[in-house]
Swiss-Prot record:
Native organism taxonomy: Bacteria, Pseudomonadati, Pseudomonadota, Gammaproteobacteria, Pasteurellales
Top-level taxon: Bacteria
GO biological process: DNA damage response
InterPro entries, sorted: DUF535
One matching Pfam family: DUF535
Protein name: Uncharacterized protein HI_1119
Length: 292
C-alpha cells in the first residue's frame, strides 16, 4: 500500500489529539495520558528527532502523513530492552539505511511496494514501508494472495549494528486461514509460510550486503497488532530455532540452508529439490529487482 503524501514542508512532533482523534463512544483518555507522559519524559530525544526529520525532505512528507511513525521514539522500537538513546539511534538509522541502499529504484518503497512477483501461483511477495505497527520496524516483506488482494503473511525487519534483525513474523487469522496455510505449505513443497518468509529474509540480507541475520527472542518482541486474537500466538523462539538459529543475545540465523539430501528419505528428495529451486528463483528475482 502506497503512502499518500501531504504538502507540509516542516515536521513537528504530533500532539496526542492527532494520534488519537476523537471517536464517539470510545474512551481514549488513557492513551492520551500515556502519550503525553512519554512525550514529556522523552522531550530531549524528541527535539533531536524533529531536527533529524527536518534534515531529510522525504521523511518530512512521510512523517506528516503517518503520524504514528513518530511514536517509537518515545515508546518502544524493535526490542523491549532498548533505552531512550538506543531507541532514538535505532529509529534514525532504520529510516535511512534502506533508502540509501536502494537508490537504483525508480520509485521509492514508501511510494509504491516493490513486487518480487509470484513465489507460487497467486501468491505475491512484496517489499515496502510498513503500514502496520512502526514499533516493529519500518520495513516489511509481505506475502499477498492476489485473487482476493489479501495479506497472508508479513515479516518486518530492521538494521541493528552490522546485522539485520527480524522483528516480526505474522500470519493470517481470517476465516479459512488454516486451510490457506495448508495449501501454501503444499504449494511451497512442504515449506511452511512462516519459514518461507524467514528464508526470503535470508536471501534479502545477503543481497543487501549483510552477512549477519538476527531474530528477536520471544520475550523481547514488541506486541503485534496485525493479528488481534488471544488464540493466535507466534512462537518466535520455535521459528528461529527451527530455522537453524542459535540463541545468544538475539537469535543468530545462518544465511545458508543445509541442502544436503543424504539424510532426506529418497521419496522426499524431489520435493526438497523443488523447494530449493523455488527459493533460488525468488533470490534471483529479488537481486534483479533491487538492482544491486
Amino acid at each position: 500500500m502506497a503512502i499518500q503524501m501531504t504538502t507540509k514542508t516542516t515536521y513537528q512532533w504530533p500532539q496526542s489529539k492527532d494520534i488519537y482523534p476523537y471517536r464517539p463512544g470510545r474512551f481514549d483518555a488513557p492513551k492520551h495520558w500515556r502519550y503525553n507522559l512519554r512525550s514529556f519524559l522523552n522531550r530531549g530525544s524528541i527535539r533531536r528527532f524533529e531536527q533529524f526529520i527536518n534534515q531529510h525532505p522525504f521523511l518530512i512528507d512521510i512523517f506528516n502523513t503517518h503520524l504514528d511513525y513518530s511514536y517509537p521514539v518515545a515508546c518502544r522500537f524493535l526490542d523491549k530492552r532498548f533505552n531512550a538513546s538506543q531507541r532514538f539511534h535505532a529509529v534514525c538509522e532504520n529510516l535511512l539505511f534502506l533508502p540509501e541502499k536502494l537508490t537504483a529504484l525508480s520509485t521509492p518503497l514508501w511510494e509504491k511496494p516493490l513486487s518480487f512477483g509470484e513465489v507460487i501461483p497467486d501468491f505475491e511477495m512484496t517489499l515496502s514501508m510498513t503500514t502496520h505497527q512502526p514499533m516493529e520496524g519500518y520495513w516489511v516483506l509481505e506475502l499477498w494472495h492476489k485473487p482476493r488482494n489479501e495479506l497472508v503473511y508479513l515479516l518486518t525487519f530492521a538494521k541493528l549494528g552490522d546485522a539485520l534483525l527480524i522483528a516480526v513474523v505474522q500470519g493470517p487469522n481470517f476465516e479459512g486461514s488454516k486451510e490457506m496455510v495448508k495449501q501454501l505449505t503444499k504449494l511451497c513443497h512442504g515449506l511452511r509460510p512462516a519459514y518461507l518468509m524467514v528464508e526470503t529474509m535470508k536471501s534479502l540480507t545477503k543481497i543487501l550486503g549483510y552477512n549477519k541475520l538476527l531474530g528477536i527472542p520471544q520475550k523481547y518482541q514488541n506486541k503485534s497488532r496485525f493479528i488481534q486474537s488471544k488464540q493466535y500466538t507466534v512462537d518466535y523462539d520455535a521459528i528461529f530455532g527451527e530455522s537453524g538459529g542459535e540463541l545468544k543475545d538475539y537469535w543468530e540465523l545462518p544465511l545458508e540452508m543445509d541442502r544436503n539430501l543424504d539424510d532426506i528419505p529418497s521419496k522426499k528428495r524431489s520435493m526438497y529439490r523443488k523447494r530449493y529451486a523455488m527459493l533460488d528463483d525468488l533470490a534471483k528475482v529479488i537481486e534483479e529487482k533491487l538492482g544491486l
